Amino acid sequence: MIDHTHLRLFQFCDSQFPTGAFSHSFGLETYIQRNIIHDDHTFIAWLKMFLQEQLTYSDGLAMRLVYDALENDDTQKVLHIDKLMFVQNLPKETRVGAKQMGTRMVKLALELYNSPWIAWYHQQMQDKKAKLNPAICFTMLGHHLGVDIETIIDYYLYQNVSSLTQNAVRAIPLGQTAGQKIVTHMIPYIEETRKQIFELKEADFGMTAPGLELNQMAHENVNVRIFIS
């Protein structure tokens, strides 16, 4: 029998879910315009780097820490991680983009579920105590639905892989079949990344490859674009 609890969380993994993820490449478009990424092989290399760097040391580790804070009713810890997620995101477009996506996800989650934690998180934003981040909201939703943190992280990583692949299909461009092959190819790396996240210390938070951040910053000066970041 299908676990409907997992299906409810997986709904938020749809690349067409209206959080605005389809409008953000997180620096991918810069690599494409510089012809560093130009086919499925070069995109896979970039996607692995993004998964094993930015999504590991920022989003993934933050999710693990937030889940522990939720279990311990530690509101100050959640606010601290929310702040760190915002200030360590140096490129303006990705920082603002993450805030916008977090806001949309929180509002959608509140429309669909009566989660006290997500309602509290939204109130903190209204009180100007939180910025709102999609990784934190996704963790709160999974926690509300009773999903274990390992599965929550797997689903979140999958959502990012799927969304970025669909964006690559449009931007490089690639065929839809090639895109699905890439997602299939990346599934083992999702598991590897989740395992790595659970080996990290809190002091590892925010470690990101400089090349990723530099290309995300450079996207501000891209003349012709189809993505916001």
Swiss-Prot record:
Gene3D superfamilies xrefs: Urease accessory protein UreF (1.10.4190.10)
Record keyword Chaperone present: yes
Pfam hit, one: UreF
Keyword match Chaperone: yes
GO annotations of cellular component type: cytoplasm
UniProt main location, coarse: cytoplasm
Subunit structure: UreD, UreF and UreG form a complex that acts as a GTP-hydrolysis-dependent molecular chaperone, activating the urease apoprotein by helping to assemble the nickel containing metallocenter of UreC. The UreE protein probably delivers the nickel.
HAMAP family: UreF
Annotated function: Required for maturation of urease via the functional incorporation of the urease nickel metallocenter.
Protein name: Urease accessory protein UreF
Originating organism: Staphylococcus aureus (strain JH9)
Gene that this sequence comes from: ureF
